[in-house]
């Protein structure tokens, strides 16, 4: 039986609490406190990166977690939970959802996404799988492989979609994803205002993930500093 993550996040906000190694808030302790702040604000779930951060957050707040593991490999361009090793590692924490790159690009060591999905279904049957997609072709592939959740996470973050924004052309891309997806859609990626989040939900998204505009203060501060410096 699958877990009840989707029931818990329906029409609600998920907050991403992530800080990479080169960022000032990089610390599992700090991410856990950030998750606590998100919890107190009313977040329905947390999206988090790395086994240690996921575990620290789960030890701190009673919220479901979308877990991922960003790892760079020299033989492949993708980095969000790219191999079965990272998938297993995140699932073993007890995270409700494991998210991974589903952008059609090569995976490290020649691993095949279909094989990874099949293995996860066998070893972690109660764990939901979220496809971090960047294009309609990616959504089709996620449908074919039976992902439980389809995210727009990578739209605007791949070479083919660089510069794209989910709100472009009155959210036309998101509308197409919603029409095509066979699984609940979670809007993610450049949702940088409450208005965008509300629009995504009104269009039919199951829930919305917001990260940088809430939990990355160096980026938030820069928007103010850039505006002031233009005077």
Swiss-Prot record:
Organism domain of life: Bacteria
Pathway of action: Amino-sugar metabolism; N-acetylneuraminate degradation; D-fructose 6-phosphate from N-acetylneuraminate: step 3/5
Keywords: Carbohydrate metabolism, Isomerase
Gene Ontology MF terms: N-acylglucosamine-6-phosphate 2-epimerase activity
InterPro entries per record: Aldolase_TIM, NanE, RibuloseP-bd_barrel
GO cellular component term of the entry, any: cytosol
Catalytic class of the enzyme: isomerase
GO biological process: carbohydrate metabolic process; N-acetylmannosamine catabolic process; N-acetylneuraminate catabolic process
E.C. number(s) listed in UniProt: 5.1.3.9
Known catalytic reactions: an N-acyl-D-glucosamine 6-phosphate = an N-acyl-D-mannosamine 6-phosphate
Family note: Belongs to the NanE family.
Chain's role: Converts N-acetylmannosamine-6-phosphate (ManNAc-6-P) to N-acetylglucosamine-6-phosphate (GlcNAc-6-P).
Protein name: Putative N-acetylmannosamine-6-phosphate 2-epimerase
Organism field: Latilactobacillus sakei subsp. sakei (strain 23K)
